[in-house]
């Protein structure tokens, strides 16, 4: 098992609020999956809810190696929590297909948020031997030898 992708994102919550005021439902529809959309309308602090999902989806797209482009959209990533409250990701459509092609078998998600910012990190793991990545296992040894 090897790390195949790492992505991180930090979001200023006030920026999400500004975009939400300016764009309204268009922004929400672009970011949230149908399940998240239902949850969003049940939240007391909907801006924080939206900011967390925005950060996680940006981080996940970076971990895939694409960012939000090339057919990968925010709505293709869905944040949910397991029975213990641990954040998890569910991938849909092109994001799920790309994860299968890259043999990603495990996903790790972590979130941190404060009053003004929210931060997310996503790590994808899988079998490196079944990927196209050209890794030189001892590249660092030649860098540190005198």
From Swiss-Prot:
Entry-linked Pfam families: ACPS
Protein's cellular compartments: Cytoplasm
Residues annotated for Mg(2+) binding in this entry: 9, 58
UniProt key word Transcription: no
EC number of the protein: 2.7.8.7
Cellular component GO terms held in the UniProt record: cytoplasm
Listed cofactors: Mg(2+)
One of the protein's GO biological processes: fatty acid biosynthetic process
GO MF, any single term: holo-[acyl-carrier-protein] synthase activity
Alphabetically ordered keywords of this record: Cytoplasm, Fatty acid biosynthesis, Fatty acid metabolism, Lipid biosynthesis, Lipid metabolism, Magnesium, Metal-binding, Transferase
Catalytic activity entry: apo-[ACP] + CoA = holo-[ACP] + adenosine 3',5'-bisphosphate + H(+)
Source species, domain of life: Bacteria
Function in brief: Transfers the 4'-phosphopantetheine moiety from coenzyme A to a Ser of acyl-carrier-protein.
Protein family membership: Belongs to the P-Pant transferase superfamily. AcpS family.
Name of protein: Holo-[acyl-carrier-protein] synthase
Source organism per UniProt: Baumannia cicadellinicola subsp. Homalodisca coagulata
